[in-house]
Structures are given as C-alpha cells and as structure tokens.
C-alpha cells in the first residue's frame, strides 16, 4: 500500500472527520498519500431544475472551504491532494476517482445512530460495499477522537470460502507496509450451517478451525510477525465482543461468495462483525485489482 494512495470519501460532518482520522493513521503508517474527494450531485441529475449560477458558485466555494478544512485536519505529515467531483451518486464518483488515482483503498465514515465506536452502514457505504472493485475501509464512529494511535495490528478474518487468497495477500501487504504484526482469526467455529447436531458441530468446528489456520499460516512469509486465534462464541456478535482488540487495530474481511468477480459484496458474517467491531474494517473484493 505504500506505493499507492488512499482515497477518502469526504463529507463535512462527523463521519467525514472519522474517515479522515483513520485514513491519516493508515497513510502515516504506510507512507501512502491521501486523495480527499468530495462528491457533489452532477448537473445531469438536477437537469429538471433551472440552473442558478449564484447557488452553484456558493456551493463550489463552500465545498472548497470544506476540503481546505479536511486538509488542515490531516496536517502536514501526510501528502494530501483535494478534489471536488460531480457524479450521479457519491459511490459512483468515489469509485471513478479511485480508478483515476490508482487508489489502493477507499475510506468512508459510518452513519451515526449506533453505539459509539461501532459502525452503522449509511447509504454511500452500503453502495460501495455492494459494487466497488477497490477495497473499502469503514471508519467506526468516534475514530476522530483516537486519531493518534497509528496502526498497531492487522487482523485477517479467514474462512473456508473462496476469496481467502486475496484476503491474505491484502493483509500481508498492509502488515508489511505498516510494520505491524498480523493476526489470523478463524471464525469457522461459528460460521457453520444451522441445524447441525451440537456434538458434531463442535467436532467439525475444531477440525475446520485448525485446518484453516494451518493452511493460512503456511501461506504467510516466514519472516512476518504473525499469530493465530480462533473465535470462541455461540454467535458472531458474541465472539467479536469477547475478542481482544488493540487501539489502532485494523480488520480485513473477504467478500461474500455472492460477489461478482473483482467486486465487493458484504456477506452476512462480515455484516454481523461490523455491528460489534470497535476498530476499522476493510472489506476486500473476491479477487484484488492488479
């Protein structure tokens, strides 16, 4: 990630401040630059309304003021570029900008209304999580207050479904770039079909967890600081709450098997994790972009 940029989908509110804070942490840790993008509705979308030159000028000036404020929040230690874009939708504008800049990551904040430090998906994040071919990072509410923690650990939530290779590759790259340890987390014991006999489920869970972690560990570079851990709980939410989370940690999850190739699709397991995670989550496409 150090050779690429990080794109922030900026909004002039608390969610935008959270996105900037997390992007700044990741950029400082990896050496990446930050592209701050504010997307306004395109003229085509508002073609039924007569153009008001005065209002459009006011909106442009206000938007540039918001972008200048965003740059000030990031400080001088991070290379920052500011962009005002027009698009039919915010998600479309962010994805197009990410392609143009070669961004390795799109960072957006989450909607308010949930427990502080937890994430509730807003409309822009939801659209990105079901269409983007660029990894998307969701900054939990309250991230602005903990912006000086750096990147202290990378956790990759691995499973048995297709897409694990892309997830591991992304996790290893980020861990190396940030000089952070990597934790492999197995959610297999609680990611099994409903209706299984309890004893059989327990046995199957244990065997699968060991196999998944062994296979993932073998795929890691020998010189990488890595650990493995198995989630323990009767539900995804309970297991996530019981796990140890470091300040400055970042979690990576893969896309659902329903995702189109090279696209994101937030699966049910990741969605359940997201509701309880106190740290940022990156959702990785089934296959990464080259």
Where are these predicted regions, by residue range?
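Small/aliphatic-rich secondary-structure junction motif
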Residues: 1-53, 152-202, 218-227, 248, ...
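Structural beta-alpha unit
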Residues: 1-2, 15, 72-106, 220-251, ...
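Active-site phosphate/pyrophosphate- and oxyanion-stabilizing loops and adjacent acidic/basic residues
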Residues: 24, 68, 72, 95, ...
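A short acidic, glycine-rich active-site loop
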Residues: 53-65, 201-211
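Glycine-rich, Arg-bearing micro-motifs that act as flexible, cationic patches
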Residues: 105-127, 151, 250-276, 290
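Short beta-strand elements of ligand-binding domains
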Residues: 107-110, 135-142, 281-285
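Intrinsically disordered, low-complexity Ser/Thr-rich linker and spacer segments
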Residues: 143-152
């Amino acid at each position: 990630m150090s050779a690429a940029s990080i794109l922030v989908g900026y909004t002039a509110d608390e969610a935008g401040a959270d996105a900037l804070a997390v992007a700044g942490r990741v950029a400082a840790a990896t050496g990446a630059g930050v592209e701050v993008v504010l997307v306004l509705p395109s003229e085509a979308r508002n073609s039924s309304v007569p153009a008001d030159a005065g209002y459009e000028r006011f909106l442009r000036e206000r938007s540039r003021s918001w972008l200048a404020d965003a740059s000030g929040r990031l400080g001088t230690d991070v290379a920052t570029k500011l962009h005002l874009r027009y698009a039919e939708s915010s998600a479309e504008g962010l994805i197009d900008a990410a392609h143009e800049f070669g961004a390795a990551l799109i960072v957006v904040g989450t909607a308010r209304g949930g427990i502080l430090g937890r994430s509730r998906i807003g409309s822009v994040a939801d659209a990105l999580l079901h269409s983007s071919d660029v990894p998307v990072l969701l900054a939990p509410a309250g991230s602005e207050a903990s912006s000086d923690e750096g990147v202290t650990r990378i956790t990759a939530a691995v499973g048995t479904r297709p897409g694990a290779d892309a997830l591991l590759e992304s996790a290893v790259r980020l861990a190396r770039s940030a000089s952070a340890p990597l934790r492999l987390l197995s959610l297999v014991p609680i990611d099994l079909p409903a209706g299984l006999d309890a004893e059989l489920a327990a046995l199957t869970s244990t065997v699968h967890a060991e196999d998944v972690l062994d296979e993932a560990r073998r795929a890691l570079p020998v010189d990488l600081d890595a650990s493995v851990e198995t989630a323990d709980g009767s539900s995804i939410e309970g297991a996530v709450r019981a796990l140890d989370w470091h300040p400055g940690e970042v979690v990576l999850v893969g896309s659902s098997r329903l995702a189109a190739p090279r696209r994101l699709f937030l699966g049910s397991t990741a969605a359940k994790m997201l509701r309880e995670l106190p740290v940022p989550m990156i959702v990785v496409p089934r296959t990464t972009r080259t």
